[in-house]
Amino acid sequence: MPEAVYRCAKCGREVKLDLSTTRDLRCPYCGSKILYKPRPKIPRRVKAI
């Protein structure tokens, strides 16, 4: 399985984790369990009514 990129909520660093081998999701730098999946940087267009 490919690595997934997450952003730590506590220290703000990007973390690459291999989900097939990792049992618990923690930041390897600060140990925080709160990780966010970063949004794509592509802007969305919403049509106004």
From Swiss-Prot:
Give a GO molecular function annotation for the protein: DNA-directed RNA polymerase activity
Q: Any binding details for the cofactor?
A: Binds 1 zinc ion.
Compartments where found:
Cytoplasm
What residue range is the signal peptide?
A: none
Q: Does the keyword Ribonucleoprotein apply?
A: no
Q: What enzyme class is recorded for this protein?
A: transferase
* GO cellular component term, pick one: cytoplasm
**Can the keyword Transmembrane helix be found in this entry's annotation?**
no
EC number(s) per UniProt? 2.7.7.6
Output the superkingdom of the source species. Archaea
> Which residues are involved in binding Zn(2+)?
11, 27, 30
**What GO biological process terms does the UniProt entry carry, in alphabetical order?**
DNA-templated transcription
The record's catalysed reaction(s) read:
RNA(n) + a ribonucleoside 5'-triphosphate = RNA(n+1) + diphosphate
Q: Which cofactor does it need?
A: Zn(2+)
Keywords carried by this UniProt record: Cytoplasm, DNA-directed RNA polymerase, Metal-binding, Nucleotidyltransferase, Transcription, Transferase, Zinc
Xref: InterPro entries = RNAP_P/RPABC4, RPABC4/Spt4, Rpo12
HAMAP family (UniProt xref): RNApol_arch_Rpo12
Write out the function statement from the record. Answer: DNA-dependent RNA polymerase (RNAP) catalyzes the transcription of DNA into RNA using the four ribonucleoside triphosphates as substrates.
Subunit composition? Part of the RNA polymerase complex.
Per the record, the similarity remark reads: Belongs to the archaeal Rpo12/eukaryotic RPC10 RNA polymerase subunit family.
Q: What is this protein called?
A: DNA-directed RNA polymerase subunit Rpo12
What is the originating organism of this protein?
Answer: Pyrococcus horikoshii (strain ATCC 700860 / DSM 12428 / JCM 9974 / NBRC 100139 / OT-3)
Q: Which gene encodes it?
A: rpo12
